[in-house]
Amino acid sequence: FGLERDVDFIALSFVREARDIQQLKALMGEKVGKVKIIAKIEDQEGVRNLEEIIKESDSIMVARGDLGVEINVEDLPNVQRTIVQMCAEYGKRVIVATHLLESMIHNPHPTRAEVTDVANAVYEEVDAVMLSGETTVGKYPVKCVEFLRKIALKSETIPGLQFAKHLRNAGNKQQLAVAAVQLAEGVKAKGIVVITRRGIMADLVSNCRPFSTNIYAFTNMSQPRRTMMLNRGVFPFKIDFSSDPEKTLQTAFRILKDREQFQVGDKVVIISDVLAEQRVDSIQIRDIPSDDIASEASHEPQ
């Protein structure tokens, strides 16, 4: 049903072992890799087999409602932290869900403890925090989203726990992404621009959890643009790629200037695994040009 309607994600409940994900992949056929799998960790067996589940999945959800019933409630914070840390080390997306602003089902303001809980998830550098009953049956669904956004934005102003500094099995592309983030932070770049078809390079850059730099990902495909929206710190756009990579870059710059993300003279780092019709991994540093200069000049990588 879902695959016929071109869903972007499938969330599988009560995943207890990697074989559960493998069975789902067998049903998905050629959609494997295009449609992303979110494994929901909801009981003790899932926690015990966490590492093999993470390796087999695209994303993990810490489903705290059922998980808090299946394990000792006092163990829940440590289990959440373990899941988040292991996902960061393997470069997998992680979502913290359920009971974030539970009191707002009935009340117009969250409790102080709920605010701290959401902030702690942001400090752990999760990719997403997800509301459940607050927006499905609650009296104040819009206020819940507004509070969640305000708490997250404020919490993002201080550095997180940086679990991603200990990436496991980082291949060449991941090392390239690490280098791009280090370069961006070193030169105090205003942003990292990623040119990618399938979103893989944007995933890898997001895995590095840059603190002071947003990631602007440009793809020419609709589904990767949608799936990249789950990645922490990534702002995805869909554009037509030109056979001239310089024109593609200038289109990206123009969009970001129009949206007031960049100004003329801002320094940016560009990382790409796609140039023209060939796959080329590269990193560049650029200063955002004026429209007049952009239309006349072709820039060489620095």
Pin down the residues of each PLM region.
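Non-catalytic helical/linker scaffolds that mediate oligomerization, partner binding
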Residues: 1-302
